[in-house]
Amino acid sequence: MTADISLRPADHPAIKSGKIGVLLVNLGTPDGTDYTSMRRYLKEFLTDRRVIEWSPWKWYPILFGIVLNTRPQKVGKAYELIWNKEKNESYLRTYTRNQAELMAKRLHDLANVKVDWAMRYGTPSIASRIETLKQEGCDRILLFPLYPQYAAATTATVNDKAFQKLLSMRWQPALRTVPDYHDDETYIEALAQSVERHLSSLDWKPDMLLASFHGIPMSYFKQGDPYYCQCQKTGRLLRERLGLTQENFMVTFQSRFGPEEWLQPYTDKTVEKLAQDGVKRIAVINPGFVSDCLETLEEIAEQAAHSFHENGGDKFTHIPCLNDSDDGMKVLEKVVRRELQGWV
């Protein structure tokens, strides 16, 4: 609702209000594949205390002395393999932008709602988008971290950054944060249909379906992070919906970094062992990723496939993420409409 303009003093500045913002946020992406862009992105990502919980005095000498001098070039080459050449950006940026634009169309019946998107690391930043929404008259904002399963290193750090922005604002918008939706029926159904649709396009049937989630250090789980349990539940619900057994369906964890023990079983080791044990055909889906990105397009579709074939496997297929598909957008829309209740 906008205040009655006739009641304002003649010299009162025009102030937009009465709008509701929906801010979709994903992890982030470098602006380019060059060394400088990669280093800037990795620095922001790897200095986040939610991501690397080691004390700075222990971690920073390793980060600034070794990691940021060696990994930008290596990771940049990996990004080059899966870069959206047409738009000169990563596919994560492409899909996240598309999701925001499609969400705005799906919420066309809610006249006071504005939809925008941001990245936790890189651009556009969460702070800049909150500021933009506020300037456009949004005095209430729904913050949607695009992670079906909650983890401190993903969902919590998005929330942290939003609250950090609010600390600097004199006139703060009301802020709601979207909880996880790891067991949502629409989400599970969308995953199941994506599996069925993809497998029906093949002329072979997999002996094993892996549901590969991004890993976190085991120490984070032991300190109370619910991520592992939520991944397992998502996996179980998907397996049951597909009518599979534990003999032909596994939950695994990928993308480990550093010397610590991470959640297991590890995806790369599992793929290698399956091939060595004589399993000839496997499919891999990434239920925890809303959009395809480096970890799915390069780490799974390229690296894992190569490892499987090198160790004796025959057929390997990667099932795309839901991305900006109609089924994927149905999931996101359902969550947004649910969380907007009481505001619209």
UniProtKB/Swiss-Prot annotation:
Major localization listed first in the record, in broad terms: cytoplasm
Domain of life: Bacteria
Localization of this protein: Cytoplasm
EC supergroup of this enzyme: lyase
UniProt protein name: Ferrochelatase
Gene: hemH
Any one GO MF annotation of this record: metal ion binding
Record has Ion transport as a keyword: no
Binding site for Fe cation: 214, 295
UniProt entry keywords in alphabetical sequence: Cytoplasm, Heme biosynthesis, Iron, Lyase, Metal-binding, Porphyrin biosynthesis
Family: Belongs to the ferrochelatase family.
EC number: 4.98.1.1
Catalytic activities: heme b + 2 H(+) = protoporphyrin IX + Fe(2+)
Coiled coil feature spans: none
Intrachain disulfide bonds: none
Biological source species: Rhizobium etli (strain ATCC 51251 / DSM 11541 / JCM 21823 / NBRC 15573 / CFN 42)
GO biological process: heme biosynthetic process
